[in-house]
Amino acid sequence: MHDLVRFFINFLVVCIFCSNFAPLNSMKIDMMKSVRFIPLVLLCVLTACHSNTSSCSSASPVAEWNRATQILMHTPGEELFNGAINPLAALFEYYFDVDSAAIEHKNYIAMLEANGIEVMTVSEILQQAPIEALRDYVSNVLQYESDIDESDHLAVSDSYRRETIAQMSRNDLIRCILLQPTVRLTTTDINTGVEAQYLQSPLFNLYFTRDQSISTPKGQIICNMNSAQRSKETDLIAFCYEQMGVKPILRITGDGRLEGGDYIPAGTRAFIGCGMRTNIEGIEQIMRADGFGHDTVVVVKDRKWWQMQMHLDTYFNIIDRDLCTLVESRLHATDQDPEWVTVDVYTRAEDGISYRLDQADIPLVAYLQGIGFSIIPISEEDELHYANNYLTIAPRHIMAVANQSHTLVQAFEQHGVKVEWVPLENLIKGYGAAHCMTQVIRRKRM
């Protein structure tokens, strides 16, 4: 609404300086004469948009059912191995084969591209970035640790570290970014006089590109991850956006927590999960900054805090403006069950920018039905095979994990849903699927 106000203010201001603008009290314009006002109107629109580009962009994601046109992904590589050898510590469910996972991911990208979607990968962006930008990034990544005084040995000095970075090839710089190495140095009486332990904190969860940021109608917001294992991923995604020429509108800081799997845009509404990975402080930071760009913010409050349903998109998802899915344990829960989900509904205040609490503790199912959604239930069997974590690429057109039940296949068919079944048997062992592996940057509004 405030963009419309800005438009009319700009319109009147420009009119004052337009010499051929007729007085308002005697305006009588025929069709031919009105043509001369077209440039004036266009100027006002451009002026209004310039002050808030993202709010005027027709490509910014507004609804999950809008046609996806550009997606950011990351095909996992050698950084995944350390996570696979101790899955639980890496936030994974089971061990899985690293090479097979990469093949699955590339196949998924090919399926998306076959639908006319531009897929950009983190590796491609790093390969195209200026090499000095990579060196600057790596200077904050590669660490030398030692109790040795720098004056006692060249190998522990910061100048030696920087000299080494200055000689690195592009591929080795990218390895540093993905593996996050630390060299722990000690002295020895033999050979070069120094030895080391080589430690790594690889970005093994990076292939879940849904989580490090969210793409709202206003623009990109950099998240603040709930887990220490994933904290460095947001820096890399912010760097990728910079290389793409995208300036994020906000970064969540301090005690605020936000992960992208908790955000689902739905036209004039935003659904945002509040629970295991995203907290109310993170959500409030977005609302205070007017970062959502939706008139209504629906905070979905989860009290179960279960790893299998860590994000909103693991138990709720949207296929079209009037069709969604919900796992059966949430659909049939009572207020005595840990699976019971309620929502707080925030709406725009009178200033058109801030939000106010309009409704509190409304049962999620009742709210969804009240705004016109039909709900397809996801059985426990299908849920455990990540059936709910599909990606909607167009109205009633989804990319979903293959090998689901016949019952679910029939339910999709009965609701006119086109499903492309994606084989992801290795990748889903990392606790995520088709939705988690994609950050939809642009959608075409339908």
Predicted stretch roles:
Residues 47-48:
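C-terminal motif of bacterial Sec signal peptides marking the signal peptidase cleavage site
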